[in-house]
């Protein structure tokens, strides 16, 4: 059916070393998106929020980059959303209707860049959802119904090379 999406996005990054030499290699960043996604199909659900479309999403964090190392701490959030066109608040037993609560997740990552002498090999170790917050996310199947448990605390190893 017909929908209308309007909103705004903003992002910023600031190198704190510009404030004081003691803060060299330290930067902060943030991004934010507001989306007003409404159903525009005539009928009982006209004007309701489009399912699985949170109004607010964002991220923020801090990077510290001394030499070849990078240390990062970040947070990601999103507001609540609905699982159906009717914007039903109460959750059904199968999760196909109801409000999906918003959530906030924290992550951290440490990386080392070996530089051009090793083909710019970069190795990183990180953790997503540090506090193992239980949350729900939307389904990604073809019928677009239901909830899935969000990713639990996850430790990861990452590598990249330029060649």
What are these regions (language model features)?
Residues 74-76, 83-89, 93-100, 107:
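Extracytoplasmic gating/loop element in the C-terminal half of outer-membrane beta-barrel translocons
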Residues 1-86, 160:
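Gram-negative outer-membrane beta-barrel transporters
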Residues 4-8, 54-58, 102-106, 119, ...:
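Residues that define the transmembrane beta-barrel architecture of outer-membrane proteins
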Residues 23-31, 95-101, 119-126:
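Glycine-rich, flexible loop segments associated with nucleotide phosphate handling
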Residues 21, 53, 64, 99-101, ...:
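Surface-exposed coil/turn segments at beta-strand junctions on protein surfaces, enriched
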Residues 16, 98, 108-112, 161:
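Outer-membrane beta-barrel pore domains
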Residues 42-49, 92-98, 142-147:
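Extracellular loop and loop/strand-boundary signature of outer-membrane beta-barrel proteins
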Residues 79-87, 112-163:
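C-terminal beta-signal and adjacent terminal beta-strands/loops
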């Amino acid at each position: 059916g017909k929908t209308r999406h309007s909103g705004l996005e903003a992002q910023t990054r600031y190198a704190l070393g510009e404030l004081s030499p003691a803060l060299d290699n330290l930067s902060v960043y943030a991004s934010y998106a507001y989306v007003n996604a409404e159903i525009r199909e005539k009928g009982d659900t006209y004007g309701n929020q489009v399912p699985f479309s949170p109004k607010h999403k964002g991220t923020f964090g801090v990077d510290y980059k001394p030499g070849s190392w990078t240390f990062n701490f970040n947070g990601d959030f999103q507001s609540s959303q609905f699982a159906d066109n009717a914007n039903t608040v109460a959750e059904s037993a199968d999760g196909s209707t109801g409000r999906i609560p918003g959530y906030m997740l924290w992550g951290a990552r440490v990386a080392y860049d070996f530089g051009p002498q090793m083909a710019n090999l970069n190795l990183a170790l990180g953790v997503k959802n540090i506090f193992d917050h239980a949350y729900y996310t939307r389904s990604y199947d073809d019928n677009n119904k239901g909830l899935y448990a969000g990713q639990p605390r996850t430790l990861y190893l990452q590598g990249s090379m330029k060649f």
